Structures are given as C-alpha cells and as structure tokens.
C-alpha cells in the first residue's frame, strides 16, 4: 500500500481501468485486490529488505532525498500497526486477545508489526519492519528493528521519533549509544518528569504565533530536566497547544 500510495488494495484495484495499467494490446494487467494480498502474504521479508535498501541507496545517490528539517538531519519514525485479525484462523505468529461481543467473550487472533519509515521533505520512505511476536510488547519488536536499522542504515538518520509507549530508559539509551537523538510523546501524567515539566510551564510565558485557518499556537521549550534518573542524563521537554477560532 505504501508503494501504491493507496489506502487499501481495494482502492488500488479501482484504478485497473486507467491507461497506465494497460499494455499495447489494451488488456488489463493489474491483478485483483485478493491476488495482490495473497502474493504479498507469501513474500519472504529476507528478499524484500535488500530491495528496500536498494531503493534508499539509489535515491540517496540521485540526491532525491532532502531532510524535512535541514538543521536536524533525517528522522526515522517508528510506529506499530495491526495488519490483520480473525476469530477463526490463526498461526504460530498470531497474537491473541479477548474481545467482548454480543455473543460473549471471544478470542481474536491478529498480526501486529512495527514499521520504520524515513521522514524526508517530500514524504516518507519505507526502510524496514518487524513483526511483534507472541508474549512481547511493541517496544520489544521495535528494539530488534532498531538494532537492524543501526546495522543496515548506520548513517541514514540522526533522529528517532516515536509515541509515548517508547518513552522508556532502555530504548532511549539504545538510541543514544549509537549516536542518535530520540523524541517521544510524554503523556503519562503520573511520571515525575511530566509533573515537573507542567509545573515549570505554568511559570514560563509561551512563544505565541498564528497559523493559517485561525489557529493560535503556544509553545514551551525547557531543557535540563533531571526527573528521569533511569536515563542517566538531562532531558528536554517541549509542549505545544493549539487553539482554533471557529466563527
């Protein structure tokens, strides 16, 4: 779906009548959504990863990759995604969960993976992904993925961006040990770091600016927090608040 820039394989199938999918004999060459899904499900990731790296190397050599923020360099975004779910079929790689339905509690089996994309000026570029295994959480899968990225793409990025689930000391230490910076969402209001940051933000005047569409942005940026002792170093906390005026 990332390569086709479509939201689903069904959306891709709707374009099969377009001229660019037809050969000189006017026959349609785009497979159905089911066929595309069946073929991709049998693809070995070991063969896909070299192809993804080749795309990156060529684009880098052709200078078609430009950083979104030149002063910060390139960033990798890590995020978990659920690819499929079923109540009737499962495999050795499925993750089980209990779901409350009208018929009672049922066991649902699903697949989940962590994706790594390179953020650049014109969008994102898929680098790699890692399946989440039974009995582990998303961060464990992301840690394996990140170690492989450090080996396969040692100079491709300078920054790792993730959501609040990744705000853990071992994960941040792994990133820092490889000379990279990390950004994660801080949303657990029980943490000392969150409480200390909110206390200082109340005492500091924000930087205020206007955006298109009647949006007012307030930003706070404070460094030197020591309220995360497990990390072993000071951290920086940034807060933003947007207010939109509706007439």
Give the role of each language-model region.
Residues 181-247:
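An anionic, glycine-rich sequence signature occurring as long contiguous blocks
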Residues 1, 12, 32-36, 72-86, ...:
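Short, conserved catalytic/metal-binding motifs centered on acidic residues
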Residues 10-21, 54-56, 127-135:
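Short alpha-helical "patches" and their helix-cap loops
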Residues 118-120, 131, 164, 184-188, ...:
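Short, structured patches in soluble enzyme cores that scaffold and shape functional sites
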Residues 35-121:
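Active-site-proximal, Lys/Arg-enriched surface segment
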Residues 96-156:
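Electropositive, glycine- and tryptophan-enriched low-complexity nucleic-acid-binding patches
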Residues 136-193:
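Domain-level cores of phosphate- or acyl-group-handling catalytic modules
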Residues 1-30:
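Gly/serine-rich nucleotide phosphate-binding loop at the start of the catalytic core
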């Amino acid at each position: 779906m990332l390569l086709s820039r479509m939201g689903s394989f069904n959306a891709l199938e709707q374009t099969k009548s377009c001229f660019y999918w037809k050969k000189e004999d006017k026959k349609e060459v785009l497979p159905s959504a089911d066929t595309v899904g069946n073929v991709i499900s049998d693809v070995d990731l070991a063969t896909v990863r070299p192809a993804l790296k080749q795309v990156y190397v060529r684009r880098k050599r052709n200078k078609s990759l430009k950083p979104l923020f030149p002063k910060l360099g390139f960033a990798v975004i890590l995020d978990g995604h659920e690819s499929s779910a079923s109540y009737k079929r499962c495999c050795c790689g499925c993750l089980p969960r209990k779901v409350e339905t009208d018929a009672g509690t049922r066991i649902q089996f699903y697949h989940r993976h962590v994706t790594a994309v390179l953020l650049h000026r014109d969008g994102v570029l898929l680098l790699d992904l890692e399946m989440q295994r039974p009995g582990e959480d998303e961060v464990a899968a992301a840690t394996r993925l990140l170690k492989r990225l450090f080996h396969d793409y040692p100079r491709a990025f300078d920054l790792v961006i993730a959501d609040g689930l990744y705000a853990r000391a071992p994960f941040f230490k792994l990133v820092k040990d490889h000379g990279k910076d990390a950004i994660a969402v801080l949303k657990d209001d029980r943490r000392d770091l969150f409480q200390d940051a909110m206390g200082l933000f109340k005492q500091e005047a924000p930087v205020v600016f206007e955006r298109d569409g009647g949006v007012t942005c307030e930003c706070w940026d404070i460094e030197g927090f020591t309220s995360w002792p497990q990390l072993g170093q000071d951290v920086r906390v940034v807060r933003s608040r947007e207010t939109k005026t509706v007439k």
